Regions:
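SH3/SH3-like beta-barrel superfamily modules
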Residues: 213-246
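Beta-loop motif signature
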Residues: 35, 195-224
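Internal/C-terminal transmembrane anchor helices
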Residues: 158-182
């Protein structure tokens, strides 16, 4: 029994190691093709690695660059967006994404956002969910320590310090917890997509015979509100809502 368990664990470890070695080899070859400007070969290898289940912002970023060099803007934007989900703080990813968006046909004015919301979003996007989670845990631990100082210290000055600084760390812990939760939900609940069709008509209902509302073009980002069979109800940045067939978009 124990021997069989050991063999099973050893086999699982071997599979993981060999799988990692395979992925590393493919990534190295893809990087070589990218450096040599052999973008089609690089794309195939990067896609192979990603389809195997391995994810990293660098992979999506390099793949996005390959598609961009090939003039395939929707695919470039899709992969830059996926890279940004994993590394929201990365300025290079954000710059290339904005550059790609500047070249798509549709120029939509987003709904106005209050300054405080923009400020919070800029702070929230300075790092990824795991980092925010660690900051939240560390801050809460410091809050507990300072709480003990407040309850058990006999010196008034230390009690005041423990109380007010403890409240500060509790606030930091709570805020960073919600930052981590937001970033994690974006990763898990992929509710945005990129239009891949050159032109698509947005309709009033999930029916090809329903009223035509407006037209979107390739490369634009849409928010997915709900799904009805093979149709998505989508919202664009200016607040307009409608339905498009799922074949026209790729989920980020």
């Amino acid at each position: 029994m124990n021997s069989n368990i050991f063999k099973a664990l050893a086999l699982a470890a071997l599979v993981l190691i060999s799988g990692q070695a395979w992925a590393d080899s493919r990534v190295d070859k893809a990087n070589q093709h990218y450096a040599a400007e052999e973008y089609e070969n690089a794309i195939q290898l990067y896609e192979d690695v990603l389809n195997s289940g391995m994810e990293a912002p660098e992979l999506y970023y390099n793949l996005g660059n390959c598609y961009y060099r090939q003039g395939l803007l929707p695919a470039a934007i899709l992969n830059y967006e996926r890279a940004l989900l994993l590394a929201p703080h990365d300025k290079d990813i954000r710059y290339n994404l904005e550059l790609a968006y500047s070249q798509i046909p549709d120029k939509i004015e987003p709904l106005g956002e209050i300054f405080l919301a923009q400020w919070f979003a800029s702070i929230r996007n300075t790092t990824k969910s795991d980092t925010w989670a660690w900051i939240s845990i560390a801050s809460f631990s410091l809050f507990l320590i300072l709480l003990l100082v407040y309850f058990f210290s006999k010196r008034s000055a230390l009690r005041k310090l423990g109380f007010f600084v403890g409240l500060l760390f509790l606030l930091i812990s709570t805020t960073t917890f919600f930052f981590a939760k937001y970033q994690k939900e974006r990763l898990v609940n992929r509710n945005t997509a990129i239009v891949f069709s050159p032109s698509v008509t947005v309709r009033s209902a999930p029916d090809a015979g329903s009223t035509e509302l407006f037209v979107l073009h390739e490369g634009i980002k849409v928010k997915l509100l709900q799904q009805n069979n093979n149709w998505y109800e989508i919202q664009i940045e200016d607040g307009n809502v409608g339905w498009i067939h799922a074949e026209h978009v790729e989920v980020i």
